[in-house]
A protein has these predicted regions:
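N-terminal post-signal-peptidase region of extra-cytosolic proteins
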Residues: 98-102, 254
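Short helix- or helix-capping micro-motifs
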Residues: 137-139, 167
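Penicillin-recognizing serine hydrolase domain
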Residues: 43-84, 89-91, 151-327
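Acidic/histidine-rich, surface-exposed loop or edge segments in extracytoplasmic proteins
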Residues: 43-56, 93-98, 114-117, 141-144
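Secretory targeting and sorting signals
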Residues: 1-42
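Active-site SXXK
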Residues: 92, 102-126, 139, 268
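Flexible glycine/proline-enriched surface loops and loop-helix/loop-strand junctions
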Residues: 96-98, 132-133, 142-147, 173-178, ...
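Short, well-structured active-site flanking segments
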Residues: 119-137, 160, 205-208
Length: 327
């Protein structure tokens, strides 16, 4: 993997020769985020150049070791700069890689916009209007930019900031003006967001969580690449992706998702940049995702194949002006 940006100290090496650290006996996965989402910070270690992938499971240390080694192998030799977060409550498993590194969000920020909208309807004790529901569906299932821009303006920065605060997503910084795709995100905060949707909490009620997950389960086929690669066919896939080229660090290619069913659920977050093409970044994510799914599920599981390139690949999901780093 490429030399990676530390959020504070410039670049530190997480090259393919870096050590894989797997600690089995430290830190349980029961820590809670604000509002009751479980496990997002459990056992988290600070990113360091000597650690490629850190997986922890007090209950299943062998599993943690296999997943860490598999992710390490999947990312070795890739030019992509990668941040990754995995959480499986049932397996008491957490994995970390560059979790505090900031990336331009591209379209994954649309889940934050949706969460803010749903939180606002709860505060106002009302349902979504027909217009809000229409725009929310377009924004999530088709990654429609006009819908995202309309809802970004509709909820406003104040409510977006309030939602981030309630969700304890303190590392997320909203993009300037109407450029939601330049919001700064981290794998740490994106995992918190996925857990807000999966587990009961005081930020979003059950109906809102179900609504958001249902939309993420209906993303159109051409946008179901990334972390769904290799997922069990009998689990429900909830996904949102982002893809954006900028003048520096190439394509930002991100995939966030959770996988639910049969009384279990787990989340995978992969954020990347320094990708020469969109397809290259998608491949980086899918190689890691296939390893994770295969290790978290029993032998004999029928897995979904990785996505093949679609005609729409290579089209930026937001137009950024050169003055803000666009190309």
């Amino acid at each position: 993997m490429r030399w990676c940006r530390s959020p504070r100290w410039g670049r530190v090496s997480v090259a393919a020769t870096a050590a894989v650290l797997c600690a089995g006996a430290t830190a349980a996965a029961g820590a809670t985020a604000a509002g009751g989402a479980t496990g997002a910070r459990a056992g988290e270690q600070p990113d360091a150049g000597s650690i490629a992938v850190n997986c922890i499971s007090a209950a299943h240390p062998g599993l943690a070791s296999r997943i860490a080694q598999g992710i390490h192998a999947a990312l070795s030799g890739r030019s992509s700069t990668v941040a990754l977060r995995v959480y499986d409550k049932s397996e008491d498993l957490n994995c970390y890689l560059n979790t505090r590194m900031r990336f331009d969000s591209a379209s994954v920020v649309k889940v934050i916009i949706l969460g803010t909208l749903l939180r606002e309807t709860e505060t106002q004790h009302r349902h979504l209007t027909a217009s809000e529901a229409y725009l929310a569906r377009l924004m999530i299932t088709q990654s429609d930019n006009n819908a995202a821009s309309a809802l970004w303006a509709h909820v406003g920065r104040g409510r977006l900031e309030y939602f981030l605060g309630r969700a304890a997503m303190s590392e997320t910084q909203l993009g300037p003006g109407g450029y939601w795709g330049l919001t700064q995100i981290t794998a740490h905060d994106e995992l918190l967001l996925m857990q807000l949707l999966q587990y009961p909490n005081t930020v979003l009620g059950n109906a809102s969580r179900s609504y958001a997950l249902n939309l993420m389960a209906q993303v159109i086929p051409s946008q179901r690449w990334g972390v769904p690669a290799g997922a069990p066919a009998d689990l429900t896939v909830h996904v949102k992706n982002g893809w954006l080229p900028l003048a520096t660090h190439g394509w930002r290619i991100h995939s966030i998702g959770c996988f639910t069913g049969h009384h279990r659920g787990y989340s995978i977050i992969v954020l990347t940049e320094d990708n020469p093409t969109m397809a290259y970044g998608v491949t980086t994510i899918q190689q890691a995702a296939e390893v994770i799914h295969s290790q978290l599920n029993p032998a004999g599981t029928v897995f979904l194949p990785p996505s093949a390139p679609a005609p729409s690949w290579g089209q930026p999901d937001e137009q950024i002006p050169p003055s803000l780093g666009g190309r």
